């Protein structure tokens, strides 16, 4: 998912930062762009991430990664899971919330 970032960049964004570790043990820092509560509809939550310090490409877009997660019994956030590409209902909901988020920016 890429998004066209057409708003003023002279203001500061204060995003939480997390580190993701890939299957090879490589760590990558990401900023949390948005979290979505999808528990009522899908039984899980979602998070949209951008690489920390990411710059827009020539088209003014930044690559966004989306994951789902469920809360652990103790209330902490569980492991991030990729969202299945064929889960149209989930992707439609994420896109709708994300577009609303962009409209508010």
From Swiss-Prot:
Domain of life per record: Bacteria
InterPro entries: UPF0473 (IPR009711)
PANTHER family: UPF0473 PROTEIN CBO2561/CLC_2432 (PTHR40066), UPF0473 PROTEIN CBO2561_CLC_2432 (PTHR40066:SF1)
Protein family (similarity comment): Belongs to the UPF0473 family.
Protein name: UPF0473 protein SAK_2028
């Amino acid at each position: 998912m890429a998004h066209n970032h057409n708003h003023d960049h002279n203001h500061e964004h204060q995003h939480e930062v997390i580190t993701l570790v890939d299957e090879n043990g490589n760590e990558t820092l990401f900023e949390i762009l948005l979290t979505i509560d999808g528990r009522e509809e899908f039984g899980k939550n979602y998070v949209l991430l951008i690489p920390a310090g990411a710059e827009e490409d020539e088209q003014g877009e930044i690559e966004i990664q989306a994951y789902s997660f469920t809360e652990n019994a103790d209330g902490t956030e569980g492991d991030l899971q990729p969202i299945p590409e064929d889960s149209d209902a989930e992707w439609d909901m994420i896109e709708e919330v994300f577009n609303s988020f962009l409209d508010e920016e």
